[in-house]
Amino acid sequence: MEPEREGTERHPRKVRKRRQAPNKLVGAAEAMKASWDLEESQPEAKKARLSTILFTDNCEVTHDQLCELLKYAVLGKSNVPKPSWCQLFHQNHLNNVVVFVLQGMSQLHFYRFYLEFGCLRKAFRHKFRLPPPSSDFLADIVGLQTKQRVGDLPKTMEGPLPSNAKATINLQNDPIIQKYGCKKVGLTRCLLTKEEMRTFHFPLQGFPECENFLLTKCNGSIADNSPLFGLDCEMCLTSKGRELTRISLVAEGGCCVMDELVKPENKILDYLTSFSGITKKILNPVTTKLKDVQRQLKALLPPDAVLVGHSLDLDLRALKMIHPYVIDTSLLYVREQGRRFKLKFLAKAILGKDIQCPDRLGHDATEDARIILELAQYFLKYGPKKIAELNLEALANHQEIQAAGQEPRNTTEILQHPNTSVLECLDSVGQKLLFLTRETDAGELASSRNCQTIKCLSNKEVLEQARVEIPLFPFSIVQFSFKAFSPILTEEMNKRMRIKWTEISTVYAGPFSKNCNLRALKRLFKSFGPVQSMTFVLETRQPHLCIQYEVLEAAQLAIESLDGILVDGTCIKVQRPVTELTLDCETLVNELEGDSENQGSIYLFGVSETFKEQLLQEPRLFLGLGAVILPKDLKNGKQKKYCFLKFKSFGSAQRALNILTGKDWKLKGRHALTPRHLHAWLRGLPPESRRPAGLRVVPPPFEQEALQTLKLDHPKIAAWRWGRKIGKLYNSLCPGTLCLILLPGTKSTHGSLSGLGLMGIKEEEESTISGL
């Protein structure tokens, strides 16, 4: 049987309005309360989503703040405080949490190879800086404390379920009673509705991803005496994802009417033998294809057939078939907080039968299909009240406690403690954390309680295991390891970064006549943004101006506005200096403008100290405004004359830009180019003198050799390859998955590098990441 998921789907809870959400950039960015209240109160929002902007000083998120978010994602606001630095709306609609850690990489790495990380930067709207890591980065972000080391764990609790368990049952609070009531129900009441099938990702007619799926053609009238069929499928992992290797169909009475091995169409990467029992030897002689079993299944099923499965959506997707009448026993036996009971547990607790025994090689699909059918029949025969009286939740929690080797603890007391870890939060709701890593980089987390650790030999193996295991766990941490920059290379990269951003923020303008109005020219070029320096170049036949701007947007605006205009009868050229660091600046600027974080952001110059108040007086003109970011001078604390406005959509930003650069406001502006956290980082870097003309930055010999030979382990190539691979993996995650990609940074005796975080929620309507 396919490995089971313990889903995290939860019932919706009422969302309270947030009073205020302050937002800062170098102590000066300001959020707009009215917009946040409007955003949170949108009644149509039915999916988990993140706020459009992060509320962080200098755009840096501490490891403790990351832990805040992860705990809130697991438990919600009723059990732990909301994160202080961002807003997660409709947390109860999250399906999974996945954290990718790129050990050895940093913020410097990301922006040194910005173009190579195209897949990731386009997919994630939120980016933030991380402080340099401690000796165990993962222990910090999941909140592991020293007192929680494995050696200090309590001893195993042995013995049966406490005798007072039944006495403490409150049937009215049991999720089965809340859904079905106390009276017995008929078969039709147990069928999943179309809305439920959509929620739990069943294949449905008309959905784009199901275009090539076949209909079972079962469209007869359904009654309480319609026939039930237990279905179970086994899958393997191929180059195209999961594919069917075995199907078993059991009719009422326990008779197996179909049991077929299936040869996948694509190359098999992993037989998943520990789950499926399928081996290369078993599958080699098989000639049956997917289309054969599809045809056979359509012929077997009567028009009013009801398929019964456990996580049946996975089976139907493996079959590439659509069936309208389904009962899913993982949803029929409702569990608290949207979790699901495992089939093995239900077989023992309800039917008293042992399945999926450890002494067997994998699961028996026919046995599982028969058990699934019997579970549905038991529910129909005895009704919800009988099931509720069994107190399955208490029994399952007791077994999980025994398996974890610990005594029961006071959950409320633990969750109220400020140092509660993510692992304890998961444990409190009966869930486990998946940790995938290389053997050499396991760290403290690998030996922690309530953590399922899989150690791999290489990054490639980590990636392959992640494809299989992530859907089976509500919370996953996947760690890849890369070679960190050497101290010499780090220093060189830092220098190049500073020089590059200085050069692409610099423009040369000319030629001008020797009698030009210098004061008017300076005033003209200063109208686009803050100027660091402005000098006359007299080495040329006619004078030119060299203007170094403080922000990239100002330089770009000057080029777009002035290149090719006539000044005193002479057509001037406005361009960036041409060096090996600026050769691809046009591509870089285009990519920055298309960065997902910049969508909906605009840059403005010429704003006054009362600009924010003026905006607030015209709320109808600037619908969708999320934040006004007003940078201040780092030395004197005065407000700068430029700002960034953050809107919910590109369309809202474009409308605002047209208004603000019009005749009434008379500001200069364009769409933003510099992501907010990058702007804060660049402003904090020590100044780097721009190179004299003609001076060339020569890369270290070993790096030059690596680029020439295009070795796969070169950091530039690694950034491109692994950015694409992780982007594809992200694209395969189920909708409603909160995903974080963390580049932890580095810390050594030679110096420290800040890290970088990327964050987003995988949405169902999201299109495939471009370029994959």
From Swiss-Prot:
Residues 228-376 form the Exonuclease domain. GO terms for cellular component: nucleus. Residues 1-10 have a biased composition (Basic and acidic residues). Residues 505-579, 600-679 form the RRM domain. This is RNA exonuclease 5. Its EC number is 3.1.-.-. It is an enzyme of class 3 (hydrolase). Keywords: Exonuclease, Hydrolase, Nuclease, Repeat, RNA-binding. The keyword Repeat applies. Residues 1-26 are annotated as: Disordered. Pfam families: RNase_T (PF00929), RRM_1 (PF00076). PANTHER family: RNA EXONUCLEASE 5, RNA EXONUCLEASE REXO1 / RECO3 FAMILY MEMBER-RELATED. Residues 11-21 have a biased composition (Basic residues). GO terms for molecular function: exonuclease activity; RNA binding. Gene3D superfamilies: 3.30.70.330, Ribonuclease H-like superfamily/Ribonuclease H. InterPro entries: Exonuclease_RNaseT/DNA_pol3, Nucleotide-bd_a/b_plait_sf, RBD_domain_sf, REX1-like_exo, REXO1/3/4-like, RNaseH-like_sf, RNaseH_sf, RRM_dom.
